[in-house]
């Protein structure tokens, strides 16, 4: 069970406490929301942090009734209260074990969006399916090609090369700057990495011969780069064996480089020989209709082009008022930086997407009224004062738009945030929502639609999209810098206040005592300042200290990452590297299968109209060669580890799990890196222990840390636990989907 902050309408709180409620710190009070857990009874449960309850032994006082109901596949917790006010924790009486894991399976797709090849395959399959079913298919209007004069063609060609060379120069500058940051050990944010990936794909597309120059040059200079720039990898890679240290560094860098090159391959658009080049023009006309002329496009146009405004693209370009409105609608914290608001919205949208798949599998009719209300409320739809038939109808409409029509969740939520009348059709609601999107979203979507259809993208459009994203990155970095300056100013102000208080108290002392006091302060200045700081916070704002302790800063996330690397080094474990290598091989296999399927579906007679670019083919060969080198390094490291293990004493029993560590081990490792209060270390470690058995999987912790590190946000311990659970559930769903795909392929082979 995960604690979530409650909305303003959910409770009546004192003003001071209400301000802190969105941050997830309610003192003696907390709200356990069952919106995302989809419990049987949608009542507000009043607990403090993690509640100690167990089946049969749970009881309560003051007209509360609670019980556990265990079904075939679910475990429900039901609580009914006759009191609308908040009840302190003392009102609950609980016996039994300290924690009870309630495992209700939320699953969603991984954070990465579909690649260009996967989107092209989906678009092609969707067209063929609609043609077979006889449904409406969007077909662009046939425009008579006007033959241009020689002078006009020369001007167009000159403009094309001008924008192409300008794009090449700007891409080279940005790539060099980001590469320099990577070499100096700086981590790229999610937005910067996406920009770097797109730029590398553009460079290889503009100059395919770069594959023969850049990639071998990078591989050859890897040992030199590791010597010249030791900060590329954390200090935890330093071991007693120089050879082992060198091999591990090479393994890590080669693996990251291979993964990045494979992502670059998937980012490169395919070439469609049959493409007429009208898609970009059609999209511009469509957006001009809904933004300027007021003309209503067809339903097929609206549904087709709405798919392009993906969650990541939409959220990254929304203004702050729009982000705040979405957070309030979804009952999320609406205070914080834009980056933080986007992060928590992304996590919530993934949860909603997972729930949609589960509800579609079970059927809307199987949900109770309470579950229907919870599901509709979580999606920003009316849940109170609505009949049961209306609840089922609007939820079915949502599932049809989201899962069948593949409309992004962010657009659907935005349409609900605008409180449009229910009489509007879904297409009209989407049209009105698209009108509110910033102009910057349209430019990126225009490039995306051409890439998906396999058409040639104009260099000018690519250049505008690149400059626009670069401006957004600069603005984001400025916000982070302002936030750091503000935090530093607040800390300096607090230190000055503490020093002023000490001087005021010292004035009243006698001269002799004053000298002793001054020497004592000089000797223990750091400890005294920390103590006085804590006492000051307790005296003036008791709630703020709780918030301070619950928040995990960026520095503490880095410290947690270093601690995990040290523990992995102690266990001599290469599990993470093996998993990443297998995942990379799976990505390559999936890419090749998708590519082959696209060629078969788009084949015109005996001629293949879709083909890879030259740069993509050359990069694929390089990645396959690097995978062979990575396999050799892993085998060499494993051979060395086996040799060392034979020399060790065999009397000690092996650990219960290769990657499992105790909470105490993680806390001790974090203590060695940075001085953090014991209580906070314990809370961080317990947040990572999902099933509360005292054991933590290091690899799962590393995945959570990498996700948070890319976003560069400060989050609470409860959110860390939520992310931990979400990533584990995504892995389970991915395995389930792979098994289903395998069965479908086997069934298709049997039919053929």
UniProtKB/Swiss-Prot annotation:
Keywords linked to the UniProt accession: Antiport, Calcium, Calcium transport, Coiled coil, Ion transport, Membrane, Metal-binding, Mitochondrion, Mitochondrion inner membrane, Potassium, Potassium transport, Transit peptide, Transmembrane, Transmembrane helix, Transport
Domain of life: Eukaryota
Coiled coil: 443-509, 550-639, 720-752
GO molecular function: calcium ion binding; calcium:proton antiporter activity; ribosome binding
Letm1 RBD domain residues: 249-518
Transit peptide range per the UniProt entry: 1-112
Protein localization: Mitochondrion inner membrane
Transmembrane segments: 206-226
Assembly behavior: Homohexamer.
Catalytic reaction list: Ca(2+)(in) + 2 H(+)(out) = Ca(2+)(out) + 2 H(+)(in); K(+)(in) + H(+)(out) = K(+)(out) + H(+)(in)
Similarity comment: family membership: Belongs to the LETM1 family.
Alphabetized Gene3D superfamilies for the sequence: EF-hand (1.10.238.10)
Pfam families: LETM1_RBD
Gene Ontology BP, a term: calcium export from the mitochondrion
Protein name: Mitochondrial proton/calcium exchanger protein
Mitochondrial matrix side: 227-752
Gene Ontology cellular component terms for the protein in this record: mitochondrial inner membrane; mitochondrion
Organism: Gallus gallus
Function according to Swiss-Prot or TrEMBL: Plays an important role in maintenance of mitochondrial morphology and in mediating either calcium or potassium/proton antiport. Mediates proton-dependent calcium efflux from mitochondrion. Also functions as an electroneutral mitochondrial proton/potassium exchanger. Required for the maintenance of the tubular shape and cristae organization.
Topological domain ranges for the Mitochondrial intermembrane compartment: 113-205
EF-hand domain segment(s): 676-711
Topology within the bilayer: Single-pass membrane protein
Chief site of localization: mitochondrion
InterPro entries: EF-hand-dom_pair, EF_hand_dom, LETM1-like_RBD, LETM1/MDM38-like
């Amino acid at each position: 069970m995960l604690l979530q902050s409650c909305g303003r309408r959910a409770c009546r709180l004192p003003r001071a406490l209400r301000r802190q409620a969105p941050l997830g710190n309610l003192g003696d009070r907390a709200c356990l929301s069952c919106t995302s857990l989809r419990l049987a009874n949608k009542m507000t449960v009043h607990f403090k942090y993690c509640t100690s309850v167990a089946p049969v032994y749970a009881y309560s006082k003051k007209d509360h009734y609670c019980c556990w109901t265990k079904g075939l596949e679910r475990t429900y917790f039901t609580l009914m209260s006759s009191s609308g006010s908040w009840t302190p924790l003392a009102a609950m009486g609980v016996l039994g074990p300290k924690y009870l894991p309630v495992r209700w399976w939320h699953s969603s797709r991984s954070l990465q969006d579909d690649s260009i090849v996967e989107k092209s395959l989906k678009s092609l399959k969707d067209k063929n399916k609609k043609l077979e079913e006889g449904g409406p298919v969007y077909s662009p209007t046939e425009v008579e090609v006007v033959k241009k004069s020689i002078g006009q063609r020369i001007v167009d060609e000159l403009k094309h090369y001008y924008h192409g060379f300008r794009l090449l120069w700007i891409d080279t500058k940005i790539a060099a700057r980001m590469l320099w940051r990577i070499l100096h050990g700086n981590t790229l944010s999610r937005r910067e990495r996406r920009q770097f990936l797109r730029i590398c794909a553009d460079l290889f597309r503009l100059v395919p011969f770069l594959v023969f120059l850049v990639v071998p040059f990078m591989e050859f200079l890897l040992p030199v780069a590791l010597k010249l720039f030791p900060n590329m990898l954390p200090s935890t890679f330093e071991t007693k064996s120089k050879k082992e240290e060198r091999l591990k560094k090479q393994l890590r860098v080669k693996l990251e480089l291979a993964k990045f090159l494979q992502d670059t391959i998937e980012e490169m658009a395919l070439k469609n020989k049959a493409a007429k080049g009208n898609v970009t023009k059609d999209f511009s006309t469509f957006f001009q209709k809904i933004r300027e002329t007021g003309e209503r496009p067809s339903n097929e146009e609206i549904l087709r082009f709405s798919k392009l405004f993906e969650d990541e693209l939409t959220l990254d370009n929304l203004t702050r008022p729009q982000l705040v409105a979405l957070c309030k609608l979804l009952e999320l914290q609406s205070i914080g930086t834009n980056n933080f608001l986007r992060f928590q919205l992304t996590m919530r949208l993934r949860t909603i997407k997972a729930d949609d798949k589960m509800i579609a599998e079970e059927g809307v009719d199987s949900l109770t009224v309470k579950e229907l209300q919870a599901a509709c409320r979580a999606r920003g739809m009316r849940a109170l004062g609505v009949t049961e038939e209306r609840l089922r109808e609007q939820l079915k409409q949502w599932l049809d738009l989201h899962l069948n029509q593949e409309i992004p969740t962010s657009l659907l939520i935005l349409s609900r945030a605008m409180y449009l009348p229910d009489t509007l059709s879904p297409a009209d609601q989407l049209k009105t929502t698209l009108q509110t999107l910033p102009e910057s979203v349209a430019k990126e979507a225009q490039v995306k639609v051409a890439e998906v259809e396999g058409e040639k993208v104009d260099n000018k459009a690519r250049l505008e999209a690149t400059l626009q994203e670069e401006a957004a990155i600069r603005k984001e970095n400025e916000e982070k810098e302002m936030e750091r300056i503000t935090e530093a100013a607040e800390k300096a102000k607090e230190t000055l206040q503490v020093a002023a208080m000490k001087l005021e108290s010292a004035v009243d002392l006698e001269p002799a005592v004053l000298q002793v006091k001054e020497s004592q302060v000089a000797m223990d200045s750091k400890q005294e300042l920390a103590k006085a700081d804590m006492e000051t916070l307790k005296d003036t704002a008791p709630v703020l200290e709780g918030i301070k302790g619950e928040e995990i800063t960026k520095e503490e996330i880095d410290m947690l990452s270093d601690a995990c690397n040290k523990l992995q080094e102690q266990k001599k474990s290469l599990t993470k590297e093996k998993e990443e290598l297998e995942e990379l091989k799976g990505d390559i296999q999936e890419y090749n299968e998708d590519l082959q399927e696209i060629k078969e579906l788009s084949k015109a007679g005996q001629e293949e109209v879709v083909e890879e670019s030259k740069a993509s083919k050359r990069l694929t060969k390089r990645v396959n060669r690097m995978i062979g080198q990575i396999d050799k390094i892993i085998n060499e490291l494993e051979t060395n580890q086996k040799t060392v293990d034979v020399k060790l004493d065999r009397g000690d029993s092996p650990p219960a799990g290769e990657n499992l560590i105790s909470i105490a081990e993680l806390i001790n490792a974090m203590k060695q890196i940075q001085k953090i209060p014991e209580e906070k270390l314990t809370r961080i470690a317990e947040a990572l222990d999902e099933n509360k058995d005292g054991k933590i999987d290091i690899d799962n912790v590393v995945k959570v840390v990498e996700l948070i590190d890319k976003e560069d946000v400060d989050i609470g311990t409860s959110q860390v636990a939520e992310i931990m659970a979400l990533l584990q559930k995504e892995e389970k769903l991915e395995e389930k989907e792979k098994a289903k795909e395998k069965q479908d392929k086997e069934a298709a082979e049997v039919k053929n």
